[in-house]
């Protein structure tokens, strides 16, 4: 456990908790009492508390969570996560900080253009699109910086890239909390157009991870622009190639239902309870898609009328109510959207990558559909890799932070080889 203490300018004491082994970081807590030699803190979100006294630079005390109590010692210092692939200077390439305007949404996208040595207008450029949830330009998670690692590798192999903070996150402006995949597509289009038209690169493609791959296909499927004379002109917002990492090929509700079932099974939940919850969740999502949130909320009791009256069922029903009442635009768009049509009508060269142990976008669920929709695409399944394309034991999210590898070297090489093969 790592307790992070901070004193604000107004003197207010703050504390957060990290549990690297469990992949949990930044859990907000309360400083109940602190003095020169004593501290009492609590974390209501997880029901954990700690009270201790400092002596000879060590804080000794009792950590409690539910019925569990343990004596622990805290030593001052910082925890340095081992991330050997994170790029460190000096770099054999140059970078430029660039702000790109999306005028239709009143958004400024801040990002990094990475340029290999001796680049020119024919140098291929990859615009990177992050997965779901607001993330910075490095797609940083659990101390890993996948997009920074990819940008570094590509630059060392003669390929330029642009990665940017999601709207409303990092240095980018706008509101990302109410944005849907369609909004992120417009952001990516503005970036792609800028790289092609302002930076004057001829070969510009997209690399999308998870939801970012969906956004890439949505751009790839957009029709060519026609002039009044019915002559086709090249749309500067269409990609010349797509790298789709952990790409979904089924409707969003199917992805979320599968994720929920997987998490329940990982928690050793009995099969009958998993089945009850999956069926109910399917019905809730269907009502949200075809009717509205209010009807979904009002239907929960009827949907769950045959459930047993157990604490587990009660907790799961409470979770269903939260989902039904969630009016977030992103969720309501995502559950009803299928990327199938976009994948089917994308005409540029495509490389799709799946991790065998990905439990967030399972290859078993998505890869057959992708193969059917994109028969000309290069599609590859990587043994032992999870959703971040790290070598993993189980693929569980909790493993992400415990793995030193940020992304498989084989994946990096395959991405570079694909791009080089397209432009030469």
State each model region's role.
Residues 178-197:
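Alpha/beta-hydrolase active-site loop
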Residues 79-121:
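N-terminal cap/lid segment of alpha/beta-hydrolase-fold proteins
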Residues 245-342:
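Accessory cap/linker subdomain of secreted extracellular hydrolases
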Residues 348, 361-372:
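Short alpha-helix in the alpha/beta-hydrolase fold that links the catalytic acid
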Residues 122-132:
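Short beta-strand element of the alpha/beta-hydrolase
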Residues 346, 352-354:
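Short beta-strand/loop motif that positions the catalytic acidic residue
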Residues 1-55, 60-65, 125, 147:
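Central antiparallel beta-sheet cores of small beta-barrel/beta-sandwich binding domains
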Residues 149-171:
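Conserved alpha/beta-hydrolase
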């Amino acid at each position: 456990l790592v307790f992070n203490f901070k004193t604000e300018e107004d003197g207010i004491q703050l504390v957060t908790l990290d549990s690297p082994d469990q992949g949990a970081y930044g859990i907000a807590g309360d400083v109940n009492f602190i003095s020169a030699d004593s501290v009492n803190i609590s974390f209501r979100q997880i029901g954990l508390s700690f009270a201790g006294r400092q002596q000879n630079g060590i804080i000794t005390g009792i950590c409690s969570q539910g019925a569990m109590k343990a004596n622990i010692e805290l030593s001052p210092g910082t925890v340095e996560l081992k991330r050997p692939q994170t790029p460190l200077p000096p770099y054999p390439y140059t970078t430029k900080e660039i702000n790109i305007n999306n005028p239709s949404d009143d958004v400024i996208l801040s990002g990094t253009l990475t340029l290999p040595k001796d680049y020119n207008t024919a140098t291929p450029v990859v615009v990177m699109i992050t997965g779901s949830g607001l993330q910075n330009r490095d797609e940083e998670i659990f101390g890993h910086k996948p997009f920074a690692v990819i940008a570094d590798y590509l630059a060392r192999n003669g390929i330029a890239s642009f990665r940017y903070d999601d709207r409303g996150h990092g240095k980018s402006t706008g509101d990302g909390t109410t944005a849907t995949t369609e909004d992120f597509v417009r952001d990516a289009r503005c970036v792609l157009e800028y790289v092609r038209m302002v930076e004057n690169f001829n070969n510009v493609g997209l690399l999308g991870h998870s939801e970012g791959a969906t956004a890439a296909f949505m751009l790839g499927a957009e029709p060519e622009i026609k002039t009044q004379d019915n002559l086709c002109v090249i749309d500067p917002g269409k990609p010349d190639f797509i790298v789709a990492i952990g790409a979904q090929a089924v409707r969003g509700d199917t992805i979320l239902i599968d994720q929920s079932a997987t998490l329940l099974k990982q928690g050793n939940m009995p099969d009958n309870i998993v089945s009850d919850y999956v069926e109910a969740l399917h019905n809730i999502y269907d009502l949200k898609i075809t009717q509205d949130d209010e009807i979904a909320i009002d239907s929960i009791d009827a949907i769950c009328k045959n459930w047993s009256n157990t604490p587990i069922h009660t907790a799961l029903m409470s979770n269903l109510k939260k989902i039904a009442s969630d009016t977030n635009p992103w969720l309501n768009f995502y559950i009803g959207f299928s990327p199938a049509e976009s994948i089917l009508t994308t005409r540029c060269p495509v490389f799709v990558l799946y991790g065998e142990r990905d439990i967030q976008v399972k290859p078993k669920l998505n890869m057959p559909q992708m193969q059917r929709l994109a028969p000309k695409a290069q599609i590859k399944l990587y043994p032992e890799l999870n959703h971040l394309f790290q070598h993993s034991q189980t693929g569980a999210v909790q493993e992400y932070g415990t793995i030193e590898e940020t992304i498989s070297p084989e994946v990096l090489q395959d991405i570079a080889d694909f791009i080089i093969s397209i432009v030469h």
